[in-house]
């Protein structure tokens, strides 16, 4: 029996520690594949031909604002409709009119992120479990651990 297809999530984050944290969170959702880009241009290149089920975008990227990047990503085939989340330390950012459906404030809260990942990606809810060994991130930041 073939393994079920994993659902792809694109995360754009320029701070390696935040990227590692998100990768560790995603270790609790093996049905999801997290792809991490560190800036807008890399995100555009990664997104070509992908069909992510969810977009997670930091706002303060080195080459653009996350809202501008979202507008550019929406022009790519297959990226017109996936939910987009602003992931930011700027809790005052207003998402109205930006194309984001939610704002996740940093620092992230594990239970909230896992519950929202389940809902937004269509996964059945999973119980919160304690990790028995350190998470191994699947990204270009893996060498930092």
Regions found by a protein language model. Give the residues of each.
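C-terminal output helix
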Residues: 108-121, 129
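The feature encodes the CheY-like receiver
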Residues: 62, 92
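Active-site residues of response regulator receiver
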Residues: 58
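Two-component/phosphorelay signaling modules centered on CheY-like receiver
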Residues: 16-35
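Conserved acidic carboxylate
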Residues: 13
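Acidic catalytic/metal-coordinating carboxylates
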Residues: 39, 65-71
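Hydrophobic/aromatic residues positioned on beta-strands within the core alpha/beta folds
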Residues: 85-88
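Acidic, metal-coordinating helix/loop segments flanking the phosphotransfer/catalytic sites
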Residues: 36-54
């Amino acid at each position: 029996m073939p393994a079920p297809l994993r659902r792809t999530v694109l995360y754009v984050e320029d701070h390696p520690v935040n990227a590692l944290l998100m990768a560790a969170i995603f270790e609790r959702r093996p049905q999801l594949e997290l792809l991490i880009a560190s800036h807008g241009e890399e995100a555009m290149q990664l997104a070509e031909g992908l069909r992510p089920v969810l977009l997670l975008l930091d706002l303060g990227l080195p080459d653009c604002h996350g809202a501008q990047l979202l507008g550019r990503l929406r022009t790519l085939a297959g990226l017109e409709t996936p939910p987009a989340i602003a992931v930011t330390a700027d809790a005052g950012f207003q998402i109205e009119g930006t194309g984001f459906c939610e704002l996740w404030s940093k620092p992230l809260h594990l239970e909230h992120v896992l519950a929202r990942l389940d809902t937004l990606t269509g996964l059945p809810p999973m119980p919160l479990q304690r990790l028995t060994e350190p998470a191994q991130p699947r990204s270009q930041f893996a060498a930092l651990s």
